[in-house]
Structures are given as C-alpha cells and as structure tokens.
Amino acid sequence: VVEGGHIKVGQEVTCILPKADRPYTAAVITLSDKGAAGEREDKSGPAIVEMLKSAGYDIKETLLLADEQFLLEKELMRLSDQRQVNVIFTTGGTGFSERDRTPEATIAVCDRMANGIAEAIRNYSMTITPRAMFSRAVSGIRKKTLIINLPGSPKAVKESLDFLLPNLEHGLGILRESEGECARK
C-alpha cells in the first residue's frame, strides 16, 4: 500500500512488487579518534556509503566514533538487534595501534565468525600492497547481521569493496534465508 484510501470498482490498480529481497540494508561506522574530535575529515565512511548506494543498498545509518571498544560494541549490537540491518561496515581501527580495537569489538558481539570474508579481502589486498598483511580486520555474524571490518584509508576501502561487493549479496541472501546453497551452478 503506497497511500491510504479505498479502491473503487473499475479503478485502475498498479501492483508494485519489491525487488527480490532488495534492497539490502546497511550501516556504516567510521572509527577515528581524530575524526570524532573534528580534527580530520572522514573520507572513508562517505566512500563506503557512495559505493553501497551505487550497488543498490539502502543506507540506514552512518556513525563516526572515537576508537573506543565499548562504544563500538554498543553500536554494533544496537544496529543488529534493534535496527536489524543486513550488513554493517566498519572502517578504521584495524591496525597495530594500541587504540585500534575494531576487531576486538566485532569478535565480542558476534555469534559466529565469517573468517573467509576478511581472509579474502586481505588476500586480494596483498596483490596491491604488502602492507595489507598488517590488517587485523575480521568479519562475523550477529543474529542476521553480517559485520565486516574494512581498512581505514579511502583508497583501501574502495579496493576492498570493488572486490567484495560482486559476491556479497549471495551471503546476505543466505543470512536472510532468501538464498540457499553455495554450490556453483
């Protein structure tokens, strides 16, 4: 129903069918102490949003947080439990700095890990730069929400999503129980 009212005999009715289980919903969280303090512009979060919108995703929320594990855990739980988004992308906080706690927060809230996603992104990124070996990014599942840690740089975010997005909908479809087997056709 697009708008309320009554249908009269003889009135033309148009049926608008939703795309099959689309659009997928997403949230994007940027982790950056300097960004949260207003000392640095967030370019990675908006880059993720732009790429997801271009791919047909419905962006439900974007956040910019300081590198605080408890804050990230709280937001990951809220976005998956209350907002029930299909996928949450984080950017930043995956390196070796003492304040980089994104993987720990993700692991703390996930019911199951999706190690293959982070491994595949890291493996692909290694073909671009050997510094990808320093990523501690992880991916996991909380209830029906997939959580994916991405790097903090806009360039690395774009490279990661160029690699990931063509196959991501299959995994999201399995989580939403609208797709089944992983076997190739």
Give the positions of each predicted feature:
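Solvent-exposed alpha-helices and their adjacent loops that cap or buttress functional pockets
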Residues: K19-D21, D81, V138-R142
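Glycine-rich phosphate/diphosphate-binding loop of Rossmann-like nucleotide-binding domains
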Residues: R22-D67
